[in-house]
Amino acid sequence: MKAVNLVSLFEESVQKHADRPVLIADNQRITYKQLQTAVSAVYQSLKKLGVQKGDKVAIMLPNIPEFVYYCFATFQSGAVAVLLNTSSTSYELTYLLNNSDAKILVTHPSGEKRYQEIKDKLETCYTVLAVNPGQNHVAAEPAGSPGPLSAAIDPDDPAIMIYTAGLTGKPLGAVLTHANLCSELDMVHATFRRTPDDVGLCLIPLFHSFGVTVNMLNVIQAGCSTVMMDRLTMDGLFSTLEREKITYIVAVPRLYMGMVFYEKAAKYDLSSLKLCVTGGSAMPADFIPVFEQKFSVRILEGYGLTEASPACSFNRMETVAKPGSIGTALEGIDIKIVDEDGREVPRNTIGELIVRGGNVMKGYYKDEAATASVLKDGWLYTGDLGRMDEENYIFLTGIKKRMIITSGFNVYPREVETILNMHPAVQDALVTGKEDLLRGELVKAQIVLRDGFHPDEKDIIRHCKVYLSPYKVPREVEFVSAITQVP
């Protein structure tokens, strides 16, 4: 029986796998039953704070067990988990909390400091919960204490909201329902075929759509376990792979490149590793066979976007991958390549990818115009350009919208340009992507200065760091007499 919402999915998995480990972090092994106890405790805490169905609970945490506790407790409350990047600056956080109508912010101590800086500017978020990793949420419940009584959850109720870069310079909140995510999970599960014996490595941030779907929700669905890593070194990565007998990794291309170039790799036993999955940015086609030969494991590349929960297409274990391809549509998803008028183009003709399926978002929060611009007649217009061959393999060729993809994160130039133009010395600015082997692209800024001002590159970057998350900050600044490239 397929789960109809994330709460029933969680409860069914706890019943089936109660004594199996689910979360492994800092040598702590948390079973499904202990996870349920922790979620129950957090649920009761949220209930005492007045969290009700439909409320927004903002979660800004790294990859620690408490992220999972608060997510599922929020689902059980019938509330919406608003997942926020832990590197969000005070400037960004003010907008995100106000735009989302968040009632509570759950964060780490450094996030609490940012909250205190902006609390007088907040319109709805009057409560902050500072989480210290390792808090004792998994202690046994007192005898006779009632378990959580979940709110009535409809499949079409919103479950998660994740902000994605907006064309206007302000992020848009993509609203994903319980039905969207359950549909996505069924497709992902059919593709990767995880079993309770699998042990994954949780590297992609859980606040990222791919991280929360594949490294949290699909783990619960499959009854397997995941090793949570918040900080990464190659020594730590390989030690963990060997010690925990990791069977699969989900990560951005940069990690796999680092693994290939790691000079001590041969001394570790990685024989347990069965599958590596990647996406978020393009993997150089000639790099994949190098990785597969060195580690004797398949690496599957795919494609997705936050608005689609996110995975849409993937290469498969049972098929031979075509170099440069993001695979074929997941079962249950329709993908077409269309022209400017929305008409399907012939095979091997470049056009825009559009997607249809139960995984496609409900819409952008409080932005009907932006929603209408991407959701048309049941199809999600992705803004990505590509072609499809006679065997339904998809190849990305470019981006219709102005966007930079760096280490799997989307950056819209307009947002960075807005911040650059706030600097008193800047008359005009243009932000573009510069090709980079490890990150895919780097953020580059061209700047025209006002007369009488002479800032250097460090001044401009320092200004950007005040307002922008680190991945959005330009890595290179070029001072020019005029902007030559038109957006």
List where the protein language model places each region.
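Conserved AMP-binding/adenylate-forming core of the ANL superfamily
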Residues: 2, 6, 19-64, 68-72, ...
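Conserved pre-ATP/AMP-binding loop-to-beta segment of ANL
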Residues: 3, 19, 144-163, 170, ...
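Conserved AMP-binding A3 loop
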Residues: 31-33, 159-183
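Structural core segment of the AMP-binding/adenylate-forming
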Residues: 48-49, 72, 76-140, 148, ...
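AMP-binding/adenylate-forming catalytic core of the ANL superfamily
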Residues: 88, 105, 249, 357, ...
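Conserved AMP-binding/adenylation subdomain of ANL enzymes
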Residues: 182-199, 207-248, 258, 262-264
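Gly/Ser/Thr-rich phosphate-binding loop
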Residues: 246-251, 260-321, 334
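Conserved ATP/PPi-binding loop(s) of AMP-dependent carboxylate-activating enzymes
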Residues: 328-332, 343-374, 411
